[in-house]
C-alpha cells in the first residue's frame, strides 16, 4: 500500500482503526494453539471478512472519499485441531492491477457457493478467491452469461443450494430495457435465469434482498441520491416474485410507509387454509437524517413485516427491538425458513466513528426479548458470525447442533488503547457478557463490513485453480 498521512488525517474513513494496513501476507501466520484457546466443540473452519483498505492514498480526495469505494482486503482466521492461523490479501481489482476490464472493489461481503469463495460489492461481478491463499482467481461471470452486476448480499438457499441475487445493468433480455435484474445460479454453478425487475420509480439504492422457500423479495426504497443529507418522503414498495417465475408478470408490489434499510435479517412464508403470508425482518430507519459522508445510521431499528399474498397488502409493520443495531445475521442454515434468533451489531453514539459498534445483540422472535452484550471499554467491533456447536467432534458420529442458538458468535474487535485486533468468541445461547475466548491477532485488522464462516468440510470442496490475477508490482509482506 502506498501511504499518504495527509490524506488519512482529513478523512473520517481513514482515521483510528479505519486507517488501512500497509502489509499483506504471503502465508498463513501462526496465531496460537487451538488447545486451551478455542472451545472444544467449535467446528474447524475459517472466519473470513472483507472491508475497505485503500491501496494508494495519494490517489484519494479526502473530501469525497467514502469507505464504500476503498479497495477490498480480505482477512481470514483459520481454526483447525492444532492451530489458529491468520492471513490477509488484497482483492486484485482493476483499481489495483490497473486492468480496466476489472470493475468494482470486492470490499463489501463474502459468499460461499458450489466450492467457490466470492468477494462481492454492488458495482461489479464477484471476485472469486483461491481459498487456501485468499488470492484472487478471476472475476466470475458464470461462463459469460452474467451481464449485470452481482449484489453485495446474495442468498444461498439451504434446500436447493441455489444462489439468488439482484444487480444493476442492462441484460440481453428480449423486449426489456430494465436496469435491474434478478438472477439464479444452480447448485452446480450454472446460471439458470435472469429476470428483469422494472421498478415503478427511478432505480433505488439496492443493497440486499430476501428469499423464502418459494419467493424472492425485492425492496424499492425511496432513496436514490446519497450525495448529501437525505429525507424519505415517499412510500416504500416490496416486490414479491415466485422463485420459479421466468419473468416478472407474477410480481406483486405491496406498499408500506416511507423508510430505508440496508440489511435483511431473514424472511419466511406461512400457508394454511385461511392465510398466505410473507414475513420479513429488516433493519430500517423511517426519517433518514442520513449523510452519506458521515454514515450516521444510529437510528436503525429491527422491524417485522407481514404481507398478505391474497389481498396484496401489508398486514403489519412493527418495530420489535428498540436497540440501534446493524449487520443482522442468523444461523445461515435457516435462510428462507423461520428462525428464532436474530443477532446484530450494536451501534453507539458515544464516539465519533463511522459505523461505531460497541456490542452484540440477540433478538428472540418467540419472546420479543433483546439481549445485549457489551464489549469491554474502549473495544469496538464489526459483524459477527453464528457457528453451531459440533457434537462428538473427532468421531464418526459427529455432527452440528440443530438446536436454536446452540453455538458461538465470532467477531473481530479492536482495542484502542493497545492498538490491538482480536477475535472474540461468545456463547450464543447464554449471551454471557464475558467472552469465552479472546485471541490476539498478529496484525492490526481495520474495521470492515461483512464476514462469513466457512466449515472445514466446505474448504475441501474448493477447486484447485492455479491461474491467478497477476500480483501487485509493489507488495509489502507481513
Task: Label every model-predicted segment.
Residues 1-478:
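Beta-propeller domains
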Amino acid at each position: 500500500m502506498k501511504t499518504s498521512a495527509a490524506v488519512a488525517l482529513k478523512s473520517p474513513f481513514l482515521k483510528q482503526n479505519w486507517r488501512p494496513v500497509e502489509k499483506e501476507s504471503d502465508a498463513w501466520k501462526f496465531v496460537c494453539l487451538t488447545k486451551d484457546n478455542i472451545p472444544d466443540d467449535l467446528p474447524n473452519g475459517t472466519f473470513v471478512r472483507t472491508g475497505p483498505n485503500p491501496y494508494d492514498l495519494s490517489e484519494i480526495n479526502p473530501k469525497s472519499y467514502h469507505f464504500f469505494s476503498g479497495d477490498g482486503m480480505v482477512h481470514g482466521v483459520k481454526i483447525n485441531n492444532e492451530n489458529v492461523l491468520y492471513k490477509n490479501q488484497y482483492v486484485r481489482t482493476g483499481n489495483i492491477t490497473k486492468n480496466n476490464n476489472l470493475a468494482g472493489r470486492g470490499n463489501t461481503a463474502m459468499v460461499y457457493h458450489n466450492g467457490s469463495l466470492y468477494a462481492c460489492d454492488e458495482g461489479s461481478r464477484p471476485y472469486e478467491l483461491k481459498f487456501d491463499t485468499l488470492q484472487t482467481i478471476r472475476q466470475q461471470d458464470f461462463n459469460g452469461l452474467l451481464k449485470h452486476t452481482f449484489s453485495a448480499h446474495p442468498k444461498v438457499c439451504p434446500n436447493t443450494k441455489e444462489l439468488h441475487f439482484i444487480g444493476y445493468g442492462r441484460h440481453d433480455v428480449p423486449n426489456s430495457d430494465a436496469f435491474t435484474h434478478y438472477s439464479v445460479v444452480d447448485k452446480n454453478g450454472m446460471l439458470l435465469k435472469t429476470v428483469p425487475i422494472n421498478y415503478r420509480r427511478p432505480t433505488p439504492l439496492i443493497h440486499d434482498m430476501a428469499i423464502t422457500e418459494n419467493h424472492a423479495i425485492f425492496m424499492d426504497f425511496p432513496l436514490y441520491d446519497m450525495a448529501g443529507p437525505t429525507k424519505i418522503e415517499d412510500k416504500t414498495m416490496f416486490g414479491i416474485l415466485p422463485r420459479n417465475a421466468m419473468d416478472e408478470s407474477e410480481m406483486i408490489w405491496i406498499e408500506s410507509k416511507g423508510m430505508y434499510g440496508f440489511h435483511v435479517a431473514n424472511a419466511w412464508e406461512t400457508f394454511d387454509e385461511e392465510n398466505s403470508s410473507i414475513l420479513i425482518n429488516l433493519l430500517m430507519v423511517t426519517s433518514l437524517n442520513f449523510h452519506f459522508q458521515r454514515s450516521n445510521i444510529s437510528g436503525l431499528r429491527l422491524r417485522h413485516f407481514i404481507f398478505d399474498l391474497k389481498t396484496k397488502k401489508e398486514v403489519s409493520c412493527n418495530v420489535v427491538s428498540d436497540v440501534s443495531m446493524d449487520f443482522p445475521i442468523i444461523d445461515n442454515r435457516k435462510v428462507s425458513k423461520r428462525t428464532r434468533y436474530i443477532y446484530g451489531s450494536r451501534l453507539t453514539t458515544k464516539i465519533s466513528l463511522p459505523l461505531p459498534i460497541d456490542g452484540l445483540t440477540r433478538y428472540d422472535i418467540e419472546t420479543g426479548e433483546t439481549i445485549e452484550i457489551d464489549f469491554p471499554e474502549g473495544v469496538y467491533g464489526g459483524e459477527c458470525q453464528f457457528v453451531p456447536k459440533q457434537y462428538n467432534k473427532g468421531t464418526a458420529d459427529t455432527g452440528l447442533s440443530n438446536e436454536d442458538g446452540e453455538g458461538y458468535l465470532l467477531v473481530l474487535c479492536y482495542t484502542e488503547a493497545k492498538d490491538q485486533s482480536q477475535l472474540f468468541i461468545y456463547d450464543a445461547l447464554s449471551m454471557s457478557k464475558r467472552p469465552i475466548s479472546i485471541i490476539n491477532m498478529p496484525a492490526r485488522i481495520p474495521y470492515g463490513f461483512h464476514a462469513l464462516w466457512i466449515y472445514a468440510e466446505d474448504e475441501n470442496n474448493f477447486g484447485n485453480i492455479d491461474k491467478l490475477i497477476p500480483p501487485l508490482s509493489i507488495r509489502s509482506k507481513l
